[in-house]
Amino acid sequence: MPPTDRDATVSALRAFFVNPPAGTVAVYLFGSVARAESAPRSDVDVAILFDQDPPRTLEGLHLGLADELQRTLGRRVDLISLNHAPADLVHRVLHDGILVCERSRSARIRFEVRLRNEYFDLEPIRKMYRRTAAQGAATH
């Protein structure tokens, strides 16, 4: 079976993150490339979990790391910190994403359990919101 874009990207990311930045707990590939639905011009979505809450801007690390990843992969990279991402985005990363590397299995699992609990705790509110929005749209 020939390697897919997903396989090649995962391999390149694993090689890139052999020595991840300090404080990295885990790295995930998510989005269209992880789902094997990417187009030639699709960007590569990468999520990083840090052991401590990084600054919201991540300017220095984020820009430098994104630039290095773009050079390595030869395509645009969208890099996010899971520490600041909304629960629904984290859920999508965990549900559809591919774990590329982890430095601390126990810290990764604690984070995943906590975020999944938050996500499912809010699910009734999301359902009610969607139902109300659909009813409002149906009356207009």
Language model feature labels by segment:
Residues 45-48:
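Short, aliphatic-rich beta-strand segments
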